[in-house]
Amino acid sequence: MKAADEPAYLTVGTDVSAKYRGAFCEAKIKTVKRLVKVKVLLKQDNTTQLVQDDQVKGPLRVGAIVETRTSDGSIQEAIISKLTDASWYTVVFDDGDERTLRRTSLCLKGERHFAESETLDQLPLTNPEHFGTPVIAKKTNRGRRSSLPITEDEKEEESSEEEDEDKRRLNDELLGKVVSVASTAESTGWYPALVVSPSCNDDVTVKKDQCLVRSFIDSKFYSIARKDIKELDILTLPESELCARPGLRRASVFLKGRIVPDNWKMDISEILESSSSDDEECPAEEHEEEKEKEAKKEEEELPEEELDPEERDNFLQQLYKFMEDRGTPINKPPVLGYKDLNLFKLFRLVYHQGGCGNIDSGAVWKQIYMDLGIPILNSAASYNVKTAYRKYLYGFEEYCRSANIQFRTIHHHEPKVKEEKKDFEDSMDEALKEAPEMPLLDVKSEPEENTDSNSESDREDTELKSPRGRRKIVRDANCIKKEIEEEKIEDKFLRDDLENKDAGDDDDDGDPAAKREHELLFGRKSTPKNKEKKIKKPEDSERDSDEEEEKSQEREETESRCDSEGEDEEDDTEPCLTGTKVKVKYGRGKTQKIYEASIKSTEMDDGEILYLVHYYGWNVRYDEWVKADRIIWPLDKGGPKKKQKKKVKNKEDSEKDEKRDEERQKSKRGRPPLKSTFSPNMPYSLSKTSNSEGKSDSCSSDSEADDQLEKSSGGEDLSPDVKEELEKNENAHDDKLDEENPKIVHISKENDRTQAQPSDTLTVEAGDSDQIVHIFGDKVDQVEEFKKQVEKSPKGKGRRSKTKDLSLELIKISPFGQEEAGSEAHGDVHSLEFSSLECKNFSSTEDDIDPYEKEKKLKRKILGQQSPEKKLRLDNGMEMTTGVSQERSDDGAGAEGMKGAHVEQHFETEGEGMPSLTAEPDQGLQELTSEKSDSPAEEEPVHTPLKEEEDAMPLIGPETLVCHEVDLDDLDEKDKTSIEDVVVEGSESNSLASVPPALPPVAQHNFSVASPLTLSQDESRSIKSESDITIEVDSIAEESQEGLCERESANGFEASVASGACSIIAHERESREKGQKRPSDGNSGLIAKKQKRTPKRTSAAAKTEKNGAGQSSDSEDLPAMDSSSNCTPVKRLTLPKSQKLPRSPARTSPHIKDAEKEKHREKHPNSSPRTYKWSFQLNELDNMNSTERISFLQEKLQEIRKYYMSLKSEVATIDRRRKRLKKKDREVSHAGASMSSASSDTGMSPSSSSPPQNVLAVECR
């Protein structure tokens, strides 16, 4: 920055413009460390010499005549040809900040410090982010500090000097020897010095007849004529002369032990001070922050590598003093690749390669660069490290070699550098050998330098010791252990199932706790298998092959889990990722762009892999850490892709499993869906198993596919024990029934059974109910254990945990009511409760599953499985009627007592979740539910509630009406609880009031349904507040459906539901859709049919039904619909009764659907909340025979279910949208969703606002 007329150096107090972070700021010079190099032309012999300003007398300006002391000590006249200011200036800025800068970073105030040609007006328009024009134009004569042009003569001189450089090395006879240098003509004027290689100091010209020496007195370097140098034999000098002449003592000590005198060393404090004060003024000032970060990282790493800090300090002291004495002080820490350069380590690495002169290959320099631990940023790495070495260390290397100065860490056991020519590997081995000899305690105190051991070996050691690697190994081992344990648990679970069956027959004499443990332990992964196995029981050949497939799938899932667990750590060890070319998504929404980038490194953060990516063509300051979901991996990069897939593996695996399940279902669609197989048995076992095992299984089901299988299987979810019991009880009836037989065949057979074996059915059901009670208790315990396991397990996140919690709560709630109902009402009630519980558990698990996928699958399944469900319903209905009639005769007298007991149970269950309502119904209802199991369980509650409602109608009061007046959107969990309580009270009053025997069955049905509803409520609560509200409403509606129907007729929902009970049911269903998007398969299937018949579906529900839910009775295909049906089976049953009674008890679902649709369309435009489309007289049912009544009620139930399924699907859709919105938006959309779902017509009728209310409203008179 110095102009021709500027002084040679600046003085303290001068106002200057100082460069700070790339910009020039006003400052004042505080201190000066003066060092001016003067190139003079000797008049005597017309030669040039480079001397320091303290060797010159006269004005320091170019062209001035001065006196100078030559290398031989004589004083001659000379002309200054060039001045170089190498001083260090400490300046103070306006804000008090201090910086130590070279003269090149300073300029006098008022001087131009920008390039005129580079004003912004003349610059092309470029991205300012990439604007990199320097403030000052680069000097043409870079590296030369003089502002004057270089003359041709000087260039020639320089070239000739370079040619002579090799010759200087030949003067080896005196190298490393202590000599006496004659300072003047007098013989007495001499001083001791050490002859060193001329290569040590490029600034001092050493001619052929001269030698370069370092004085022991002032430690400076001088070029001395050979004639003035005499070899000194200090050992022969007398002690008196050693003491008398300065420097001789130091020379003697050096000669004897090669101990460097103190004046040849710089105080380590000065080194640290200069490095800290000049830390930020390195050439790349723009990257100061980066350098600081890198320096910190290096300091963290150094303790691992530096084994001899004392020797390092000794090295640095000599190096810094050497550089200062030769006129090139190191005033700031050298930087390479934005990291502080470890000169000690660099010196050692080059020494092990035989010295700088022996390294010809750029690859070796590149290796040294990497060994320093500096990231290679560009292709100039080898050149940069070589240049840095030549600048800072080459002279010192020559000095040490010529003076035979060694450092124990570097030259250990090695006499001379020249003799050192070792291969890189040998040096590595030696370094490793030497490392143990160094004091290990010094490692921590090492801030700057590194040791012999190469960074590579250090890195290898650290990698071996790294906790990540260990963690990965442990995780792999854990995965293997988990698989083994799971297989063992599977076997135990199967055995336990067999034992449970025996225990169920023996009234639970076995050890239920152990069974629960096994079932719960195996629950998460075995549940799906068990359900599938249950479904497949009738088909032994298929079952075997399917089981094998499922086992293999389970193993794959466990492996994938293990992989995903250890995957994060794998990324660190996978070298293939570094440098991988990828595409990265940048930005969000419409502004998102994709940039090409390369991965620079990977890192783990809270179990998530982060990638440091560099965008091609962008400055490194745009490098950023991104998550895997923003990276688009190239096709050829399997590793990264797999990693990405593994992260999403839960979803993909579940989707694959679902697809497989669907394919299996399709292959079996020739036959009725597996549900039909159990439908005949459903009356007995469906309720039992579904409640007891089905729920725990579904709740614990690990994958979405498993959940879907459970839903599709509906009644199939029965535990093996229940299945066996069902088969035993119904073998006589159902063995003959084929899944493929039409509904009519099933109905006729069931009618025959009912007529021939009414008493048998009751007894069987009673026994089954006892078993169910045991099983259910076991299931509750299992569910609790399962919850604990789920919480512990890494996968127990989100869906699973929610499902488990719901199922547990449901199970807990239902056991009380079920036990009471079982003891008071009969085994049938228990079976009903279990079925409902199972359905609810299914719905909860289904809710956990992706609503979309579930809906699709359910739709498909329903298309193929409608007939089986219908068959089941018809059969169940027939059996139910027979059971009801028997119960009426048997239980008519004790109906009121039962009612009182039920009411008590109601209150108990209210605290638990409404299962008590279920306990109220009588055995008749129990039979109906057990017979109908899947959906029949839901239908039965409706039938009995209607009857009960007839009896209890006068008892229904404003409380029940108030309970029903609940807005789906407005319901809060608190409101839900209160509503549930009110409904329960109303239902209790209804059940108490109803005296006829029909009431007990109705109550029982409601109870079974209610418990499932309660389960679903719990599940939905865990999932969402909305779903919780709906579920609670469902459970309340179902429990109190007996009274609800009456209440509904009296009151309608405020929002859009015409009848409180129906609206509550709709709410429950909607909430279930949201929370449990899929209810149990059986219930959902029945509901789907009924809903289709019901014209009041919401548009979404109608669509799902059209897709297949409506066509098929299977609830699997209607995920949302299923959930709604599960939640509202009782309500739906009640509604269909009301509708069907006015029409004709014997109407079949298709006709009823059309009629209902027509009615809906008619009623929709003008229907008021109290216009009940589903209302009918219970006495009409009394006029029908058992078969007609069952078929009639089933049809009604199916229609109602369809409607609710549609509502459910719509609610699920709304729920999904709400997830994306903020809380406010969610609440608003929730209200809109519930309203729209209640009022919208899915396609059954054009006007849907009022019809849904009508559909929901059930008038029982």
From Swiss-Prot:
Residues 579-631 form the Tudor-knot domain. The modification Phosphoserine is found at S679, S719, S867, S1113, S1149. It comes from Mus musculus. DNA-binding protein which modulates activity of several transcription factors including RB1 (retinoblastoma-associated protein) and AR (androgen receptor). May function as part of an mSin3A repressor complex. Has no intrinsic transcriptional activity. Plays a role in the regulation of epigenetic modifications at the PWS/AS imprinting center near the SNRPN promoter, where it might function as part of a complex with RB1 and ARID4B. This is AT-rich interactive domain-containing protein 4A. Keywords: Chromatin regulator, Differentiation, DNA-binding, Isopeptide bond, Nucleus, Phosphoprotein, Spermatogenesis, Transcription, Transcription regulation, Ubl conjugation. GO terms for cellular component: nucleus; plasma membrane; Sin3-type complex; transcription repressor complex. The keyword Transcription regulation applies. Residues 151-165, 276-289, 300-310, 541-551, 565-574 have a biased composition (Acidic residues).
